[in-house]
From Swiss-Prot:
Keywords: Calcium, Disulfide bond, Hydrolase, Lipid degradation, Lipid metabolism, Metal-binding, Secreted, Signal. SUPFAM superfamilies: Phospholipase A2, PLA2. Residues 1-9 form the signal peptide. This is Acidic phospholipase A2 Bc-PL. The active site is at residues 65, 116. The keyword Repeat does not apply. GO terms for cellular component: extracellular region.
């Protein structure tokens, strides 16, 4: 239920730790997936950037995740450079597809974890639509 591209995999730049934790969450909810590659270049919001109307459920999951991170950046608890969502470490557990964020409620770490958890669960429910992989961004993401 995810988009996968193996082309250019060797060119993936090092990712912030939170991105790696997010990928672990996706692996938990979608066993056998390749999270560093999945969801890249799918729709208008999965991958870098994002604009226009999401083209499907998976793309809506990505947009909601982007929006969640944008809200975190506005949160005073997460305003320092060490607390921005892309680098903030958090703690979570995975048991048979069930994700639990374990940092204290209300902390920046917990807020970031909750965003990633919600997105990972959303991805697990989103059907894969090949037609939305590597779409023409200029014409379909208005």
């Amino acid at each position: 239920a995810v988009c996968v591209s193996l082309l250019g995999a060797a060119n993936i730049p090092p990712q912030p730790l939170t991105f790696l934790q997010f990928n672990e969450m996706i692996e938990c909810t979608i066993p056998g997936s390749f999270p560093l590659l999945d969801n890249m270049d799918c729709g208008c919001y999965c991958g870098t950037g994002g604009r226009g109307t999401p083209v499907d459920m998976l793309d809506r999951c990505c947009k909601e995740h982007d929006d969640c991170y944008a809200q975190i950046k506005e949160n005073l608890k997460c305003s320092s450079l060490l607390n921005v969502p892309y680098v903030k470490q958090y703690s979570f557990t995975c048991s048979e597809g069930d994700l639990t964020c374990s940092d204290a409620a209300g902390t920046c770490a917990r807020i970031v974890c909750d965003c990633d958890r919600t997105a990972a669960l959303c991805f697990a429910e989103a059907p894969y639509k090949r037609r939305n992989f590597k779409i023409d961004y200029k014409t379909r993401c208005q």
